[in-house]
Amino acid sequence: MIYNYFSEPSNVLHFLEIFVGISLMISSIQHLKNINCFSNDGLLPWDLFKKNYRPPLISHGTFNQIFERKGMFFMNILRIILLPLFIMGNKELHLLTLFLITLLTIVIYVRSAIMCNAADQVNNIILTALLIHYLISDTPSNPSLIYFYASLLIISYFSSGLLKLHQVKWRNGIYLKQVMITRNYHHPRLIKILRAVNRKKFKYISQVIIFWQVTSFLMPLLPGMIFYFYLFMCLSFHLVTGFLLRLNSFIWTFTALLPCLIYLHEKIFACL
């Protein structure tokens, strides 16, 4: 049933928009909860310009106000207001809300990159590609966009696995154990349990994750049951990682792309 549902491009994109919308909603709520972390001076990382002065445009008062605490507050509030309109799929407002949400998301990301994770980067790519697609494509549910998203997800998995494969401490489980302990400071009992776990278990888990990620490029070519096993690995990885590391938007963003893999898999096997 799921396979048949996601064989339609419109269903895939609608699912993606809902999950990305939820991810952005959670991200904005997290920004509002941590709004006091932003100063009143505008926290754009000026050192990115590799200069000892701020360019005239950036030094302008209006520009700087966008990036200060009040600016961040109102941008996140505006994004929260726009997201339901975007998710509900109102045809008249869809393109306008998508444009505004994309613009807000990129500006918020630039302003608070230190608070962002891989999900925020992927959200930027998803929204930008979706906006370009709706602007230039004659058909709202063009499969080429779904193929792009499926490729994006596979590249994300594969590159992550390849980087881990080249790191000895990832292969032997040391980094995995360190990440699980240091990112769970809010769960003292869990930290105590994790510290007591034998490092060999982390080694095996780490190697399974690396193997799954490195071989992820084969997913669209795998037969039914093996393909669904890989999908289960993907979903489990995002759920467990998101829960343990408190990456709330991470769960929604990457899960949003899984139907794109299902669609790609279905189209490949339909041609065989």
PLM regions and their residue ranges:
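Alpha-helical membrane-anchoring segments
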Residues: 1-272
